[in-house]
Swiss-Prot record:
SMART domains: PP2Cc. Residues 145-480 form the PPM-type phosphatase domain. It comes from Arabidopsis thaliana. The keyword DNA-binding does not apply. This is Probable protein phosphatase 2C 40. The lineage of its organism: Eukaryota, Viridiplantae, Streptophyta, Embryophyta, Tracheophyta. Its EC number is 3.1.3.16. It comes from the Eukaryota. Mn(2+) 1 binds at residues 180-181. Binds 2 magnesium or manganese ions per subunit. Coiled coil: none annotated. Mn(2+) 2 binds at residues 180, 408, 471. Keywords: Hydrolase, Magnesium, Manganese, Metal-binding, Protein phosphatase. Its cofactor is Mg(2+); Mn(2+).
Length: 493
């Protein structure tokens, strides 16, 4: 990407990924003794994506990193993870591991995962939040996704949003996450520096469990570890369910640890009780696309139907009061509360029905930390906001073209069908272009027209005031298949 002035704003962050057209994985005889990739699952497969394009546009001011947890997150961890210009290799001793905020519940999770089947976990009991150097238990192989030979990371902040992408082409997987923060970016920052590592840790535990377990399913005996070099277990239903459970456990753990941190620091920062974040995670492992979401960010698949026409398939659920299913769930869970939805928001405060954080709508003690009109009256039966995610796994087929992963700001202006139509049209005529940046350009043009501005007038409106015309918008486009093309990704702030 050329440096210089951009008509849609100043481009401060630019990253993108282009897959090589080669076999993914390395031969077993080339792996040193004791070397494990993808937690022991030695994948010999071709990547099911060809490139990644991403972009983010700020409507809110992009503030300094959070100062929670004694400032360690904002001053040490996030700077080591953010890569504003390109994907870069994960350092051998990532600063990410300096945050041992998850240690107590990680040890509990290790015990429960080793002794239980693949069932949805309950949130772990809150433990004390503390910071120290992190070291995984010796019984779990250190490294996993972080130690794969070609793991690369990119990400950054735009307004209250955070975007994160981690890729290992050699193992054929891609992790993408959008944390759409609200009432501040503390929760989004917390997720950016903890959730990926927590997912990695739980996947290590899954590997350990599968190595110790023998399963008899439909009469077929699977020796899960005695012959692992000859079997790709990432394609088994047992593994798929295990991955979904890992994502679920990691999210519950993040919620527990974040709210514990809020309780510890709310005396000095009472605003933390209202801070929250939507969560959208996609994990592409070989041909399987795992999706987890809380809130109203979306993953939308563009796929060809039987008539060879491109159609949009939403892989996520919209967790808002506008969703009749969600509203009905809320009402059924709080039968004794006649005033749940006020003015189209939960207790008149929040439109999303599921999110991480936002403790004042979950615990009476946290609501009491707020003063005056900020405090929610008649908090009769909390929690009113759920942390139970929607999850699914989609098997990538030859009919699947690309996936749009985006915060709700995109869908304030475009329907799912309009978004995939714009991307398809752009990529068809600009095979080496940047579809995510193009979507943002179209969004800004539409926002300007809607407000009665010229494009230049809108882009000259400073962040903060620009929030009147569009939200923070984060977009990633994952191009599926093995077509070779050049991609870029941009963050506008």
């Amino acid at each position: 990407m050329q440096e210089g002035t951009d008509p849609y704003g100043e481009i401060e962050i630019s990253f993108g990924y282009q897959c090589n057209n080669k076999k993914i994985g390395i031969p077993e005889d080339k792996i040193a003794d004791g070397r494990e990739v993808l937690g022991g699952f030695r994948l010999q497969k071709t990547s099911s994506f060809s490139c990644l394009s991403g972009a983010a546009l700020s409507g809110n001011p992009t503030l300094a990193n959070t100062n929670i947890c004694n400032g360690v997150i904002g001053s040490e961890i996030l700077p080591s993870l953010d890569s504003p210009k390109s994907f870069r290799k994960v350092p051998s001793s990532p600063a990410l591991s300096k945050l041992d905020i998850l240690s107590p519940s990680l040890h509990g999770s290790m015990v429960s995962l080793s002794c239980s089947s693949s069932t949805s976990p309950s949130p772990p009991e809150p433990e004390s939040c503390y910071l120290t150097s992190m070291s995984s238990p010796s019984s779990v192989n250190e490294g996993f996704l972080l130690s794969a030979m070609e793991v690369q990371v990119a990400g950054g902040a735009a307004g209250e949003d955070r975007v994160q992408a981690v890729c290992s082409e050699e193992n054929g997987w891609l992790f993408c996450a959008i944390y759409d923060g609200f009432n501040g970016r503390d929760a989004a920052d917390f997720l950016a520096c903890t959730l990926y590592e927590s997912i990695v840790f739980h996947l290590q535990l899954l590997d350990r469990q599968m190595k110790q377990t023998k399963s008899d399913d439909d009469g077929e005996k699977l020796e899960l570890l005695s012959n692992i070099s000859n079997v790709d277990y990432s394609s088994t239903d047992l593994f798929r369910q295990g991955v979904l459970d890992c994502l679920n456990r990691a999210l519950f753990q993040a919620e527990t640890d974040f709210l514990r941190m809020v309780e510890q620091e709310m005396e000095e920062r009472p605003d933390l009780v209202s801070v929250g974040s939507c969560v959208l995670v996609t994990l592409l492992v070989g041909k399987d696309l795992y999706v987890l979401n809380l809130g109203d960010s979306r993953a939308v698949l563009a796929t060809y139907n039987g008539n060879k026409k491109l159609q949009a398939v939403q892989l996520t659920e919209d967790h808002t009061v506008d969703n009749e299913v969600e509203e009905a769930r809320l009402l059924s869970e709080h039968l004794d509360d006649p005033k749940i939805v006020i003015g189209g928001k939960i207790k008149g405060k929040l439109k999303v029905t599921r999110a991480l954080g936002v403790g004042y709508l979950k615990k009476e003690k946290l609501n009491d930390a707020l003063m005056g009109i900020l405090r929610v009256r008649n908090l009769l039966s909390p929690p009113y906001v759920s942390v139970e995610p929607s999850m699914r796994v989609h098997k990538i087929t030859e009919s699947d073209h690309f996936v749009i992963v985006a915060s709700d700001g995109l869908f304030d202006f475009f329907s799912n069908e309009e978004a995939i139509g714009l991307v398809h049209s752009f990529v068809s005529s600009n095979p080496s272009g940047d579809p995510a940046k193009f979507l943002l350009e179209r969004l800004v043009a539409k926002a300007a027209a809607r407000a009665g501005f010229t494009l230049e007038e809108l882009t000259n409106v400073p962040a903060g005031r620009r929030r009147r015309y569009h939200d923070d918008v984060t977009i990633m486009v994952i191009t599926l298949g093995t077509d070779q093309r050049t991609s870029k990704a941009s963050t506008f702030v």
